[in-house]
Structures are given as C-alpha cells and as structure tokens.
Amino acid sequence: MKSTRLILFKFLLLAMMALACNGLSGGDQPTVVTGSGDIALTVDNYRQLLGGVNNGGDPGSKGPSGYREINWDSLTDELAAPNLYAPDFFNAAEAPRARGILLDTPGDGLMVSADSDNPYGALPRFGNINPQYADIFKTFSEERLFSPVGSNIVNLTFFVPGTNQPAVVRGFGAVYTDVDTNHTAFEYFDQDGNSLGKFETPLSDNGLSFLGVVFEEALVFRVEVRYGTGALGPNDGDGDVDVAVMDNFIYGEPQPAN
C-alpha cells in the first residue's frame, strides 16, 4: 500500500510540475496570424494586434504601441528594377523614410519591381528577370513588389527610426505572393542571437498569402526571411524550385534595445 501511495504521489507531483511548466511557457507563446487568398481582413487584424496605429515614417520612437509599414510603392524608378534597392533606404534620418529597418541578403542585392510606366521599359512584377513573373505574381498594394536577387534569403534588423540605435520590435509580418510549397518563411531572433521560433506561410499558388507573428513584448531583434526555396531566375520552373516574392512589410514600433 505504501509503495502504491508513493508511486501515486510521485505521479501527481510530476503532473503538477508539468502543468506549472506549461503555464509558464504558455504566456511566452506568440500570436500567429495567417491567411491566403483574400487577405485584407487578415492583414488588418495583424495591424490591430500591433496597436492599430500606423506611425508612418517620422523619426523617433512613438512608444510601445503602433506599427510601421512599407508597401514599396513610394520608391522612385531609380531605386526600382532594373536597378537595385538601397538596403538602408527606410533607415534614413528624415521623414518619410525614417522607418527603422535595414535589409540585407547574402545574394547579389535587393530589388523592388518596376511599375508599369517606368522609363527603362522593364516589365512589372519582376518580368525583367523572367517574363512569366509579370503574369504570375500578384500585388496586395499596387504596384511594386520586393525580393532578393541571387538568393532567397533576406535578413531584417531594426533601429529606432531616424537613428543608428539598434531596436527590438513586438512582431513582423508580410504579404507573400505565389507560395506553392511548404517552407520556413520567418525565423525570429532576439538580440542575443537566440531563435524565438520558425513559422511557415500558408500556400496560395498564383495568389496572396500573409504571415505575421506578435510577441507579448518587444523581443525581436532580427528576422530571417526565406522567399520560397530558390532565387528568382530566367529558368524558374526547372526542377522543384518554388520562388515567391513579397509585398507589404508590417512590424511593431521599434523600441531601443537594451
């Protein structure tokens, strides 16, 4: 009888410890927002989770609430295809470019797609790289899109808008176009380089998808973004390579990193 009671006691103790651990970790779990197809309401829901106020492109931190958004459409032709995009364009000191984000890639560079009346004669929606893309890629906000060139990876780091002071954010989300296969889309890191989690975007062949993650606190120092399983190219379609590009970026108001 004593042996049975001891075993039962140990079982209950282990169960209580497991529940306690789950309770502690549960509060740290981020909110994940996903959608595909008609994603307008999904995107707006994500904005609301970040505070619902677009803090625009003014320098300085606007407090712990609100978000910054980039839709790429304000860029001039000189900064769009067939030309490369300046990685620090939205990390400028002055409005409206003071949005506190720096982009980098291990590839050849970054590119924003041409609009339909650009002076270079470049096809829109990355048709300058592969003419098929102009018909395949859709836009969420007209009419420019964003992608790395020579790689399918982009790293995002954050700054207090208008300064070179490193920052952290509560979350980051973005619109994908033409996601055909399951793959890790975002991996979030804190300022010590620890992974905060990997997340996949929903599928939407020739359509739009959205993935956004929100943490309880501003923890995100860097985000690694994967654009499909391969880089854009003139021979896309050969093999099992799935390419995808992006439209709007939405991220929490950057807060000074400790």
For the regions a language model picked out, list residue spans one by one.
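Bacterial N-terminal signal peptides that target proteins for export
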Residues: 2-11
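C-terminal motif of bacterial Sec signal peptides marking the signal peptidase cleavage site
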Residues: 17-20
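Surface-exposed, well-ordered secondary-structure segments
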Residues: 25-258
